[in-house]
Design a protein with these regions (language model features):
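Conserved P-loop NTPase motor cores
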Residues: 1-91
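N-terminal helicase ATP-binding lobe
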Residues: 7, 84, 89, 97-105, ...
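Generic recognition of flexible, low-complexity loop/linker segments
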Residues: 22-24, 53-54, 91-95, 99-107, ...
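Residues that form generic nucleotide/phosphate-binding pockets
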Residues: 58, 81, 91-99, 151-154
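Conserved P-loop NTPase motor module
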Residues: 100-157
């Protein structure tokens, strides 16, 4: 079971946190594997501390975790559920920077963290950074910036 954009589910009704919690606890009994995907730890901060604790438990109970770039102010929230070394935190923050503009061509450069992730197994093992390299076909299928690129091209014309 894959729950991408988990923040949307939690915003639809924070009480769904109880259903998701049950799934994370009973998934093996049901013969399910699961992947929960969201953007930031702030997505797991709900209207009450009790609901927020339940949501943070999703991460606490995950034996394998993948992180992309995160803002520096996310580190404190993340460390409430997972210890990170200073190097791991610095790397995640570095990856969150926006892309620059090439001064010679005026072209936008990709952000430094595009396709970069860190895998954490358990709590004490060091994070393993890696880069995803998409094929041309995968890039076309998963390009979420297409509308933005087209709008920028129209603006330049």
């Amino acid at each position: 079971m894959i729950m991408d954009e988990l923040w949307q589910t939690l915003r639809a009704s924070e009480l769904l946190v109880h259903q998701i919690d049950a799934l994370t606890r009973l998934n093996r009994q049901k013969g399910l594997g699961q992947i929960l995907i969201t953007h930031t730890m702030k997505d797991l901060t709900l209207s009450t501390e009790q609901l927020s604790e339940i949501a943070r438990g999703f991460l606490e109970r995950s034996s394998v975790k993948y992180f992309g770039g995160l803002a520096r102010n996310e580190m404190e929230l993340l460390e409430q559920v997972l210890p990170l070394s200073q190097r791991e935190k610095d790397l995640l923050v570095e990856w969150s920077a926006e892309g620059a503009t090439d001064p010679r061509t005026g072209q936008s450069l990709p952000p430094p963290g595009r396709g970069r992730f860190m895998m954490k197994l358990g709590e004490n093992a060091p994070g393993v950074p890696f880069k995803m390299n998409l094929t041309d076909t995968e890039h076309r299928i998963h390009d979420t910036n297409e509308a933005w690129v087209e709008a920028m091209a129209r603006a330049r014309a």
